[in-house]
């Protein structure tokens, strides 16, 4: 079981296959996704990798967190996440996982926070049918109707579907196909929609319900800490500094 990565949702576009068919894809960008720490059975009781992505302002990082980043010899990260892995899939601390960690054609599971919709009624939130348009119904066409019995049971049961806040929930979309990767720009293109808004953080991992292709890199595709980046990445890094 390999590590996943943290990416940022850029938006949606489409790509064309050799047969001329267009495929809708979501563009995900990896921005210096580095391994920050290891979790081991001896010390933590399980095996995992802690990875971080993005650059955080030092003033927004606590002293304890700054110390952990200093031990790992990485810059303070804006977003952290843990991924359970097997012993043979541990990546060295400080290594930067690149976009070609995933290969075209393989399936991945993506996790993100859905777009917030605010307070929503039963029709929008739960796909209720609403009441009749005529025959005595007035004003309450989009109401949810009865929420419980009268004397028996004489209450509304817990978890009854009712109006309320919609969105801002952690959702995992499974079995999305990787269409293309661009290691030089840190881009991963996956087929279909990904939960969340543009700019939101997305976790990408190998699909748990699909067989892993035999040619995926193990433990993963990464650059050692301090290794030189490809020449095409150097100007972009200077511009963002």
Curated annotation (Swiss-Prot):
Coiled-coil ranges (or none): none
Region (Disordered): 140-162, 217-241
GO molecular function annotation: rRNA binding; structural constituent of ribosome
Pfam families noted in UniProt: Ribosomal_L3
InterPro entries linked to this entry: Ribosomal_uL3, Ribosomal_uL3_bac/org-type, Ribosomal_uL3_CS, Transl_B-barrel_sf
Gene Ontology biological-process annotations: translation
Changes after translation: Methylated by PrmB.
The keyword Transcription is assigned to this record: no
Keywords on record: Methylation, Ribonucleoprotein, Ribosomal protein, RNA-binding, rRNA-binding
Membrane-spanning parts: none
Domain of life: Bacteria
Compositional bias ranges of the Low complexity kind: 229-241
N5-methylglutamine sites (modified residues): 151
HAMAP family: Ribosomal_uL3_B
Role played: One of the primary rRNA binding proteins, it binds directly near the 3'-end of the 23S rRNA, where it nucleates assembly of the 50S subunit.
Family as reported in the entry's similarity comment: Belongs to the universal ribosomal protein uL3 family.
Subunit (UniProt): Part of the 50S ribosomal subunit. Forms a cluster with proteins L14 and L19.
Protein name listed in UniProt: Large ribosomal subunit protein uL3
Source species taxonomy: Bacteria, Pseudomonadati, Pseudomonadota, Alphaproteobacteria, Hyphomicrobiales
């Amino acid at each position: 079981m390999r590590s996943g990565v943290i990416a940022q949702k850029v938006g949606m576009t489409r790509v064309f296959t050799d047969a001329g068919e267009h495929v809708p894809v979501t563009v995900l960008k990896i921005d210096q996704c580095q391994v920050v720490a290891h979790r081991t059975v001896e010390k933590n009781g399980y095996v995992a990798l802690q990875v971080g992505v993005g650059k955080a302002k030092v003033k927004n990082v606590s002293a304890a967190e700054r110390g952990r980043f200093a031990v790992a010899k990485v810059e303070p990260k804006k977003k952290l996440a843990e991924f359970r892995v097997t012993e043979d899939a541990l990546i060295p601390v400080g290594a930067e996982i690149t976009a070609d960690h995933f290969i075209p054609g393989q399936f991945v599971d993506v996790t993100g926070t859905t777009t917030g919709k605010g307070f929503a009624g039963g029709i929008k939130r739960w796909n209720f049918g609403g009441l009749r348009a005529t025959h005595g119904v007035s004003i309450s066409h989009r109401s949810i109707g009865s929420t419980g019995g009268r004397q028996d049971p004489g209450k509304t049961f817990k978890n009854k579907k009712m109006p309320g806040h919609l969105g801002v929930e952690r959702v995992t979309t499974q079995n999305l196909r990787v269409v293309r990767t661009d290691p030089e720009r840190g881009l991963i293109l996956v087929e279909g929609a990904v939960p969340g808004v543009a700019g939101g953080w997305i976790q990408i991992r190998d699909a748990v319900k699909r067989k892993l292709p035999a040619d995926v890199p193990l433990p993963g595709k990464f650059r050692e800490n301090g290794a030189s980046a490809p020449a095409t990445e150097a100007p972009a890094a200077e511009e963002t500094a």
